[in-house]
Design a protein with these regions (language model features):
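Glycine-rich, often acidic, oxyanion-interacting loops/wings at catalytic, nucleic-acid
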Residues: 36-131, 216-222, 230-232
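Short, solvent-exposed helix-loop connector elements
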Residues: 21-37, 65, 88, 178-184, ...
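Conserved, surface-exposed functional patches that form binding/active-site neighborhoods
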Residues: 5-14, 44-58, 206-210, 214
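Basic, amphipathic alpha-helical segments enriched in Lys/Arg and hydrophobic/aromatic residues
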Residues: 231-233, 237-283
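Short helix-capping/linker segments at secondary-structure and domain boundaries
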Residues: 16-19, 48-49, 110, 151-155, ...
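Phosphate-backbone recognition surface of nucleic-acid-processing proteins
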Residues: 1, 128, 133-140, 145-245, ...
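Short alpha-helix plus adjacent loop in nuclease-associated cores
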Residues: 1-24, 28-29, 74-80, 178-191, ...
Length: 283
């Protein structure tokens, strides 16, 4: 079987039927490791918070009115106002609280490391990260994750290829003339798919440029800013249209996220090509 497979691969390679797989370079791989470490830390932080909150709930300790969970005021309340009769429960509370604080410190430390890593990236990667932040719903961490998971966006000839890479396209079950489309395939990059779906929730709001988004867009060219504004209008209309047709919010946001990938591709390719032309013009 191995010999037959090898011969088949050799024939496919000779005929040009094989598609090369992108292998991340050292810079992309290092950034990907750091970004995924931060994601793991956030998930551990969520688990630690759940343990503490469920422990307090199980013993009837309710958060005071006007106090939001996991703020400094909330943690001060846990440390000073929550007490138990038995020493074993006091130790349990102390341990859960320590884990929550440790997880928060870990996330903050990794986010500082990501900031430092961005400053050390090649100019082209930094430019794409800045440009992607012109899109509503995509701040620095989301842009860095996209860059780390995808690499150069210009390696995709068409935005549909990027959509398929993320696994955000519809699955298909076809037999003869009968075509059946189902839920998204989820066969692509789960990290990329998660980021764009989270970002897509921002487009349920009417198009607008707030203070935070305006600050991010200062680092982008007018062409990139125009594409980001076009994305706001188009994706909000898409969201409103699908909701109006009775689609559930999760399905709608997934569809908007898939279309958002098209704008991510357009902006990334625009910046990469623009930077690749400049050195030749200077020469």
């Amino acid at each position: 079987t191995d010999r037959r497979d090898a011969a088949k691969l050799a024939r496919s390679y000779r005929s040009g039927d094989l598609t090369a797989v992108w292998v991340p370079d050292a810079a992309h791989e290092a950034l990907r490791d750091l970004v995924r470490a931060r994601l793991a830390a956030k998930r551990d932080q969520l688990r630690a918070r759940h343990r503490l909150s469920k422990f307090l709930l199980r013993h009837g300790r309710r958060t005071p009115e006007g106090t939001n969970a996991w703020t400094e005021k909330y943690l001060h309340w846990v440390k000073t106002a929550v007490h138990f009769e038995h020493t074993a429960q006091e130790v349990t509370l102390s341990d859960y609280l320590h884990e929550v604080e440790h997880a928060a410190e870990r996330v903050a430390r990794l986010e500082r490391s990501i900031d430092a890593a961005i400053d050390a990236l090649p100019a082209k990667m930094r430019a794409v990260i800045d440009a992607l932040q012109s899109l509503r719903g995509i701040a620095q961490l989301s842009a860095v994750t996209i860059m780390a998971e995808v690499g150069e966006l210009s390696r995709f000839e068409h935005p549909r290829q990027l959509m398929a890479y993320s696994g955000a396209v519809s699955s298909e079950h076809t037999s003869g003339e009968r075509v059946r489309r189902g839920a998204i395939s989820k066969t692509g990059n789960a990290h990329l798919r998660r980021i764009v779906v989270e970002a897509a929730w921002a487009y349920r709001h009417r198009p607008a440029v707030g203070k935070t988004l305006a600050l991010r867009q200062r680092r982008s060219s007018p062409a990139v800013t125009a594409m980001a504004w076009k994305a706001q209008n188009r994706l909000h209309q898409r969201y409103a249209r699908l909701i109006g047709r009775g689609k559930c919010k999760q399905q709608t946001v997934t569809a908007v996220g898939r279309e958002l990938l098209g704008f991510i591709w357009a902006i990334g390719v625009h910046v990469e090509r623009e930077l690749s032309v400049r050195p030749r013009q200077a020469a």
